[in-house]
Amino acid sequence: MLTRRLSCLALLMALASPAMAADAPTYGEKLEGFDYGWPVKHFTFTSQNQPLDMAYLDVKPEKPNGRTVVLMHGKNFCAGTWDGTIRALSASGYRVIAPDQIGFCKSTKPEHYQYTFQQLADNTHALLKTLGVDRVTVIGHSTGGMLATRYALMWPQQVEQLVMVNPIGLEDWKARGVPHITVDQWYQRELKVSADGVRQYEKNTYYAGEWKPEYERWVTMLAGLNNGPGKARVAWNSALLYDMIYTQPVAYEFNELKMPVLLMIGTKDNTAIGKDLAPPEIRKTLGNYAVLGKETAKRIPHATLIEFNDMGHAPQMQDPARFHEALLKGLQAR
């Protein structure tokens, strides 16, 4: 029944927005039509009594250095948005595995799924086991930083190094005063995603007020996915994921991380889930990464903090050369 309602809603939205359909490309429910520039592989498995398909990239270097890196993308990102990082790591001898998590991008978006960071971590662990990969360095960006933290806490013996790039979840938004909204309310918000809205948000948050032509590709990807034929299902899974992010903080467990941790922070980032819902006096205190990065580094036993004082939420995309130089040095210094 939900599938029928979502499909009908997607059709009505498409019919009501002919200008949008004519002006911008749209992509399928599993991001069909958008090319990552790398061969996409698929891991099929059963979870929560249903068959699922996890898309992933597995890029092997020409001159291996013996290390494997797992890249965990953020909420508004995909495996493909790691393109520059994949190239930098591969050129330095790292094997790179970059999944699209369930609910995202080129992977299955279930009608019903109990999303937890533990479940997503377990899905990723199953993928690595199938690939015969044991010891890994895990790099997580944004929401992927929360997932990478959970993964490292669940399998500390497997994670030789953890890297977090502007992770969200450095503060507990509920405890800070961000009000809860229901999944249905998140869903209604996600149905309104547009290219203009994505572009403005990314400019202000990801790139610290800057804009370059190469950023437009990722606006097209996200807006095209959210306004394609799978619009309703994409929005529904996005709503479920936002509820997961809001209700499952990892900030209280950073002190339990046993491995070396590299924390890479663009200090002009201002990301905070649901910040616009908070009262003005609270809103202005949220997402202060110039403070959050330093506070978090103090809570992690073996942390190294690298700050980029002129960058926002996505330093690996804002200034790839400078970011990757710092990343590669940090990986070697573990």
Model-predicted segments: where are they?
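Glycine-rich "HGGG/HGxG" loop immediately N-terminal to the catalytic nucleophile
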Residues: 80, 101-117, 173
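Conserved HGGG/HGGXW glycine-rich cap/lid loop of the alpha/beta-hydrolase fold
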Residues: 48, 52, 57-106, 326
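Flexible "cap/lid" loop of the alpha/beta hydrolase fold
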Residues: 149, 153, 162-193
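N-terminal cap/lid segment of alpha/beta-hydrolase-fold proteins
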Residues: 29-61
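Conserved alpha/beta-hydrolase catalytic His-Asp/Glu region
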Residues: 193-255
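Conserved serine/cysteine hydrolase catalytic core
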Residues: 227-298
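Conserved acidic catalytic loop of the alpha/beta-hydrolase fold
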Residues: 118-136
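Catalytic active-site module of serine/aspartate enzymes centered on a nucleophile-bearing elbow/loop
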Residues: 290-334
